[in-house]
């Protein structure tokens, strides 16, 4: 329930021009509550003025918009474009304009706490996603420098220095403005600090240049994804030339590591990469989905001296030898999040799979086993392996050929144990598809199921949880993938880049065919 203090703040920010005129009369300790009230009601003009005259040393969106004693509503999942644009322009004017009420003591602005979600709670329904926030903030930094150089700022602007912490997203479309802002960072009052960085649709040359620019920021999270053609030799250069002492999370694009591409001279490359990663002493999360690591997992992970807590090995083609190492490794006793999707664990390494879950049972929170060939006969392996994992919160088993009867058994097990469980990705039961289908399902077959039968099965399964007091557990079936705000925001650019890459491949293939044809014709003429 909102306090009287917050209700008063709401009433004040909605008085329009009067609120802006009377802002200078307010005590500095009212600014945080007014910030949340104006954000909640999308009072953009007032929000701009509030930021422009901010009297405190910190402006942290997670703290300001999260649950508070005055207002329990969590606004961190609202990336309202209207409010965030007002916030960023207000930050620019904080630097450029002379102070009228309080001294300029702002030291840190933290934008990391807001989350991009599929359904916006703001009234305008227009979002400013991570990519757009990155572009706008870097433009604000650049515009601030231009205004100062043109003499369009107060003298106090040259004495301002504010660290601006951001979880950035850079693609080819915003690369130029981002790199320009980073180059001017030492001269700009707004000191950009990329705590996290996601990179997509970028050439290797631009990627390495960008990473060099942010190296001094000490990023904690680096995601190189999708349309960045990064391979093992490039990763070796990246890790050997750049220093990221605070890096905690590292993501590589699909097929960045592929042991089948390694020549005889590169057979030791995985060990070299492991040794380079061992220098990242804070590394706790490693995402390698859709790489090919067959027989090389030990080389890659054994040099690490600090245990990984999150690892994605989905569709990495690991074999029994890899799993034997992993189940007995330093990492196995510290895993919080594990994804082994795409591996038929019951056929390839049932005993070591059980051992792995036994060793990480005290820490494991999330387990991904999508398309692992788990059918009714192999369900016992899963339930036995999960038995010691009392802290499990998430279970993802899409794409497994389990019937409704088997899922009833599984949900009874989940309902009677696992007190922390909160999220289950439920596969469409095998008996909801035609009898002739084979697994893994192709995209066309995937959505061709008996929806009425599925809804009935789902209702029964959710009912099992509800009867045991677990109605709060989210049960979903995202057949086309879980919503990804970053992909959704940049899907057009990603599609164009992928089409361009496809055209280049086809063009090269056609050139090769034409060359071969010309050679054959030349031989025939001879």
UniProtKB/Swiss-Prot annotation:
Q: Which family does it belong to?
A: Belongs to the PRAME family. LRRC14 subfamily.
Q: Where is the signal peptide?
A: none
* Swiss-Prot/TrEMBL LRR repeat ranges: 103-140, 191-215, 244-279, 280-304, 305-336, 337-355, 361-388, 389-413
Query: What domain of life does the native source organism fall in?
Result: Eukaryota
Q: What is this protein called?
A: Leucine-rich repeat-containing protein 14B
Q: Which keywords belong to this entry?
A: Leucine-rich repeat, Repeat
* InterPro entries linked: LRR_dom_sf, PRAME, PRAME_domain
Cite the Gene3D superfamilies for this sequence: Ribonuclease Inhibitor
**What lineage is on file?**
Eukaryota, Metazoa, Chordata, Craniata, Vertebrata
Q: Tell me a GO biological process for this protein.
A: positive regulation of cell population proliferation
Question: What gene name is given for the protein in this entry?
Answer: lrrc14b
